Amino acid sequence: MKQTVYTASPESQQIHVWSLNHEGTLTLVQVVDVPGQVQPMVVSPDKRYLYVGVRPEFRVLAYRIAPDDGVLTFAAESALPGSPTHISTDHHGRFVFVGSYNAGNVSVTRLQDGLPVELVDVVEGLDGCHSANITPDNRTLWVPALKQDRICLFTLSDDGHLVAQEPAEVNTVEGAGPRHMVFHPNRQYAYCVNELNSSVDVWQLKNPHGEIECVQTLDMMPADFSDTRWAADIHITPDGRHLYACDRTASLITVFSVSEDGSVLSVEGFQPTEVQPRGFNIDNSGKYLIAAGQKSHHIAVYEITGTQGLLTEKGRYAVGQGPMWVVVNAY
C-alpha cells in the first residue's frame, strides 16, 4: 500500500504533497500553489480527486490525483455560497458538502465524473456551522452548529437535497460548541468534539426505541488545565480502538481508548504536539498520526503504539505558513 499525505497552508496558499513510507517517514513530492487561501480538504471515495475549499473567492477546487505518486493536477472549480470551513463527500462520490462558519450554512454541490458542476442545495440558519458529516449508510448528514449548541440532522435525497429529519436536531450542553465528528466503524456510534469546553460527546445513532442519545460526555483536558479551552479536531483509527482529539490552547492531543462496542471512551494520555494544532489525521493503516501546527508552521508524525494507542514522535517537517488541514490517501 502506498500512502500520500496532503497538508493545506492557507497563509502561503500552498498544498504540500508527501509520500508516507512504512516506517513513518515523509518525503516531499510536490508543492502546489493554490489560487486562494486553501483550508479544508477531502479525498474522493474513489481516491482519484482531492477537493479543497478556498477563500476569499469562495470556491471548491478539484485536483486530479496521479495514481502512482499522488501528484496533483488542477481539474475544475465551482462557486460556493460562503467561506468554506469544512468539506466532505457522500460515500458514493456524487456530492460535496461544505460547511461555512461565517455564513452559517451548509451547501451541497453535485459531482459529475468526479468534478464539481453545480450547487444543488443550501441550508441557512446554522450559526457557526463547522462541519458536515454523512453517516456510514449515506443517508443522514450531521451538521454541527457551534454557536447554537446543536447538531442538525438531514436526510440526503437522491438528487442531493437536504430534508430535515424528525427529530431535526440533537442538543449539546450549553456552551459546548459542537465542531467536528467521526463515526465508529460499527456504524452504531458517533463522536463529536466540542470546541468551547474541550469535551467529546458519544452519540448512539439509534437506540432500540429509534432515538438518538448522548451516552457519554468526557472532558479531554488534563485536570490541572485552567486556560481557555479551544478544541479543534477529532479522528478515530480504522479499527475503532483508539480516538484522538486536539486542543489548540494547550497544544495537546488527547488519547482515548474506545470500548469494543464503541459506547465508552477512556482517557489514556496526553501528547504535547505542534503549537496550535488546528488539524490532524490518521493514516489508512492506523499506525501513524500526522498533526499540523498552525503557529509552528510544521507537521509532526507520530507512531500509534501499544494497547493504549499512545503516541511516539517519529519526525517533524517544515511546511507552508499556518498549516490547518491534513488528509491521507492510500492506493
Swiss-Prot record:
Gene Ontology BP annotations: glucose metabolic process; pentose-phosphate shunt, oxidative branch
Coiled-coil segments on the chain, per record: none
UniProt pathway: Carbohydrate degradation; pentose phosphate pathway; D-ribulose 5-phosphate from D-glucose 6-phosphate (oxidative stage): step 2/3
Single GO cellular component term: cytosol
InterPro entries, per database record: 6-phosphogluconolactonase_YbhE, Cycloisomerase_2, Lactonase_7-beta_prop, N2O_reductase_N, WD40/YVTN_repeat-like_dom_sf
Enzyme class name: hydrolase
EC number, UniProt record: 3.1.1.31
Catalytic activity: 6-phospho-D-glucono-1,5-lactone + H2O = 6-phospho-D-gluconate + H(+)
Gene3D superfamilies given in the database record: YVTN repeat-like/Quinoprotein amine dehydrogenase
Highest rank taxon of the organism: Bacteria
Keywords of this entry: Carbohydrate metabolism, Glucose metabolism, Hydrolase
Name of a matching Pfam family: Lactonase
GO molecular function: 6-phosphogluconolactonase activity
Function according to Swiss-Prot or TrEMBL: Catalyzes the hydrolysis of 6-phosphogluconolactone to 6-phosphogluconate.
Family per similarity comment: Belongs to the cycloisomerase 2 family.
NCBIfam families named in the record: PRK11028.1 (NF008258)
Protein's name according to its UniProt entry: 6-phosphogluconolactonase
Source organism: Salmonella paratyphi C (strain RKS4594)
